[in-house]
Amino acid sequence: MKLLYTDINHDMTEILVNQAAHAAEAGWRIFYIAPNSLSFEKERAVLENLPQEASFAITITRFAQLARYFTLNQPNQKESLNDIGLAMIFYRALASFEDGQLKVFGRLKQDASFISQLVDLYKELQTANLSILELKYLHSPEKFEDLLAIFLVVSDLLREGEYDNQSKIAFFTEQVRSGQLDVDLKNTILIVDGFTRFSAEEEALIKSLSSRCQEIIIGAYASQKAYKANFTNGNIYSAGVDFLRYLATTFQTKPEFILSKWESKSGFEMISKNIEGKHDFTNSSHILDDTAKDCITIWECINQKDEVEHVARAIRQKLYQGYRYKDILVLLGDVDSYKLQLSKIFEQYDIPYYFGKAETMAAHPLVHFMDSLSRIKRYRFRAEDVLNLFKTGIYGEISQDDLDYFEAYISYADIKGPKKFFTDFVVGAKKFDLGRLNTIRQSLLTPLESFVKTKKQDGIKTLNQFMFFLTQVGLSDNLSRLVGQMSENEQEKHQEVWKTFTDILEQFQTIFGQEKLNLDEFLSLLNSGMMQAEYRMVPATVDVVTVKSYDLVEPHSNQFVYALGMTQSHFPKIAQNKSLISDIERQLINDANDTDGHFDIMTQENLKKNHFAALSLFNAAKQELVLTIPQLLNESEDQMSPYLVELRDIGVPFNHKGRQSLKEEADNIGNYKALLSRVVDLYRSAIDKEMTKEEQTFWSVAVRYLRRQLTSKGIEIPIITDSLDTVTVSSDVMTRRFPEDDPLKLSSSALTTFYNNQYKYFLQYVLGLEEQDSIHPDMRHHGTYLHRVFEILMKNQGIESFEEKLNSAINKTNQEDVFKSLYSEDAESRYSLEILEDIARATATILRQDSQMTVESEEERFELMIDNTIKINGIIDRIDRLSDGSLGVVDYKSSAQKFDIQKFYNGLSPQLVTYIDAISRDKEVEQKPPIFGAMYLHMQEPRQDLSKIKNLDDLVTKNHQALTYKGLFSEAEKEFLANGKYHLKDSLYSETEIAILQAHNQSLYKKASETIKSGKFLINPYTEDAKTVDGDQFKSITGFEADRHMARARALYKLPAKEKRQGFLTLMQQEEENDDL
């Protein structure tokens, strides 16, 4: 055993490679061992340090792989299971327990997180060199009994399936101890690099090999000062020192301090000595010179986006200086927080990168396919699950148009549940092509219908049916087409996912082939395996920027290192125990255990592990290290890491980067895609601010560069503007939609739509777009239902009582096909019908026969011509006649409405005046009767606040007051209206005033007609206060944003409340007089 150590300013890998090279020249076989997380980088570093850059005598590997080299040809080798296979074994074991058998974990038998914890505990017991029996020191005996029972069943299942129930390292250790490998090991030298501690399993192997290998050489980082110190707690080198001292005691050998030929820059050495002095309590410090300050810099940025962009531009500048991507390493404080942002910005700057981390499969279409399939079975064919399956792009053959059409029908008909999906669609024949839909339904659902009917049977039979189902829906062919047009790197990702998927199927066949399972269990097992699976990619080329977590970095890893997100939350990383065994229980087990096995207690290792990680990070670069921190991390403020505070205190430069500085040098632009992105950002921001001379110079250089690039690609720069100008509809379309020889057809609702937003009129009445419809009743259907009840009620001139007539009207309406189908679909619809019946009965109290009023007609259609160029169509719900012969118009409303002269003036309430104009100009009536008014009737069941009601008599009175006609009434008919149920306050108009209203109403139609016929429709939703937009905006279509486009909104003309009525009447009269002139 040889123990070597050197300080952080020298290269331990170079030292150990020299040892390996000399041993190889002497004829020994060398195994160079690196940690799992560093094996790829360590292999490259070892090869670069070898004089010949390669050697057949030197094998760079890991402990687990080392075991395979020596035991591959050993007899009685059993099949190993990966984590997914182990999870399946535990799932099967837990399923064998009856309810109540597991006292602590009984409710977690099917919980995926619990199964994952069991798998982690199983592997940790192997690594710790412990058996399940040694958990008897747990605080809870019931917990130990449950875990023991579970693990015993797992052991039986592994033995029955002839699976390997021990790790490769444990098997290798047994073989070494037995002496079977002595011949192979006697010519072997083992070199161990990159460790600061061994697991119990690795330590047992080292002990076994120490007496059988020719030599074992272990290297670690520690300074002579730290190694000779009596007290090492808190020392920056404490991890390496404690490791070396433990090995020295265990193997009775003295560590040797050695120096490499390569030495880091003096600046890094000076900083390292300052940091060491702060942590060994000697307070020795060295003033940083300019060389040291050039080595390490701290950047403070505003947020993560700015932070990554600064680094991306710095990388581009390194390329201009002649360096390669492979010379640059990017480290992340929190990979999950930065991965998406970094990927997006690096692609903008054309920086190829490689994430040194296993990637999850959760976002892959194949995972969505399995998840949707599992949900379909579990939740009995919810519409969203079925559609999600079809939308994966790898299910069946269907065009996007057919899929959209199918989805529209599913939403309309509210198709859910297997019965509705597996039977022909019959609802909505007037709106949809049911023949086309049923053809689509059969092609998509026939394979699924057959598969979901799978009964409980042996796993192998279910798997075969599943494979047949995948063939029917063309899964592999669809996946091939999906990835066919992708880049080579993306294709490799899909291949890795497919390989993982097939491995899961093989594991299932092996483990559950003879086990009886129902389809839910089958899909749940496969889906959980897919969701938890990960895969690793090998970089397509060596010349890429490597990206990984900072705690995986080794000293002197690359020329330039950028460490992002070095905030207090992530630097240092505080390891937390989330396993089934607490730290206290781990300590109890370790104290009671007299074997070589022991649990690692990470919380006890946090300090020295984090100190060494910080030291490694500060020496990760050979030329320059940049540490960056954002002021906002994940949209919340975070503090600077205490390690960075130490650097700042000893004089390391601290730069506030702020927003990207704009300099006139061409290399500061970055690259074409990045510049284009910045132009887009500028377009989206406020650009009316004053620019500094430096910013003006930058953009003048940038625009010249951008114009050259765009010209070479044949692209023109569009005018950047906030305008929402629309294109005039072609004359051909306008002629087809509005023939010149025909009058323009309008209605009061169409006019309201036009003045709400001209573009809304274009969408609704020119393009003919409709809102998503449904078989379930909504406000439109509710209003139609109540209209029909009152129509039948008022036509009934029989001798029955009013209540009998009302009940008869309700019953007849309920039996009409259209309403019967609408309100009998489900419990929700039936409940809506009960509410509507209550509303009808409550509103009908106002319709009782009144001696002063009779119903003249109902559902009266009318056509009103204006200058022979505009035809206004409509239906009047009811026309009443008073005792003096005057007529009035009633319009039923399902919500509260009243006549607002301000809204009327602005074109938003033309309905009542239009109805008055219609009946006053009726050609079929020779002698025109007077008009007493036009009004709304709110169909409602009045509700009162009982806390404000003093006695029950007041309750009845207030209910009757709520049921009144509201609108505009003729002042001449006041005496006939006073005793009726009419709201007359501020609602009486003289004949002259009504004439003014009618004239203005016609003017509104004429102005709208002129605009409509011009084909130019503005995006101008109305606003009442010039601060908020009240009209319909259609943001997804128009791109209208209130904060940017308020100037485009149509501001309503408003007057003070006291002046509103007379003021608007005066305005209308003046406008009419001006038009006459």
Swiss-Prot record:
> Per the entry, which co-factors are needed?
Mg(2+)
Q: Which domain of life is it from?
A: Bacteria
Which residues does UniProt assign to the signal peptide?
Answer: none
- Gene Ontology biological-process annotations: double-strand break repair via homologous recombination
Q: Could you give a GO molecular-function term held by this entry?
A: ATP binding
Q: Which SUPFAM superfamilies match?
A: P-loop containing nucleoside triphosphate hydrolases, Restriction endonuclease-like
Q: Which InterPro entries match?
A: ADDB_N, DNA_helicase_suRexB, P-loop_NTPase, PDDEXK-like_dom_sf, PDDEXK_AddAB-type, Restrct_endonuc-II-like
Q: Which Pfam families match?
A: ADDB_N, PDDEXK_1
Keyword Nuclease attached? yes
Is-annotated flag, keyword DNA damage?
Answer: yes
Q: What UniProt keywords are attached to this protein's entry? A: ATP-binding, DNA damage, DNA repair, DNA-binding, Exonuclease, Helicase, Hydrolase, Nuclease, Nucleotide-binding
What EC number(s) does its UniProt record assign? 3.1.-.-
Q: How does it assemble?
A: Heterodimer of AddA and RexB.
**Miscellaneous notes for this chain?**
Despite having helicase-like domains, this subunit does not have helicase activity.
Please name the NCBIfam families in this protein's record.
rexB_recomb (TIGR02774)
- Role noted for this protein: The heterodimer acts as both an ATP-dependent DNA helicase and an ATP-dependent, dual-direction single-stranded exonuclease. Recognizes the chi site generating a DNA molecule suitable for the initiation of homologous recombination. This subunit has 5' -> 3' nuclease activity but not helicase activity.
Family as reported in the entry's similarity comment: Belongs to the helicase family. AddB/RexB type 2 subfamily.
Protein name, as recorded? ATP-dependent helicase/deoxyribonuclease subunit B
Q: What is the lineage of its organism?
A: Bacteria, Bacillati, Bacillota, Bacilli, Lactobacillales
